[in-house]
Amino acid sequence: MRSRRYKKKGPVRSKKVTYDGITFQSGLEKYMYIALKKAKIKAKYEGQTYELVPSFNYDKSSYERQSNGKGEYKDRGKKKILNIKYTPDFVGSDFIIECKGRANETFPIRWKLFKMYLFHTKSEVTLYKPQNQKECDETVSLILGKRKT
């Protein structure tokens, strides 16, 4: 019996797609846009950016290499640390949708920080994170069902 060889999954390589004059980051986002439009659900594509962690000045020493692991091991502290921002794919009046085929390295922590941000700001939105077309269709059904009640 032949043993199966599995390909190592590389980095996320989604292809940008243009539709209705909007450039989407992936085909799944385009599919979600069409599904929302067909159901007459108003949502803005990448309509709002949230600051999850504000920038700050780090005035202490920090010995490290560059963030890509290259360069000299030296003091890279005493500088401004940039903020962490998050822009969801679709923002509606009572929902936020993030289409994710395959999450990249930073997404899980950013998603948790975003949930924490919504918790602390007492936001009353429902989050949806469809990962395929079937889940996009289910998301639309859930939004429509919630609005009927």
Where are these regions (language model features)?
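Electrostatic, structured charged patches in enzyme active sites and in nucleic-acid/phosphate-binding
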Residues: M1-T149
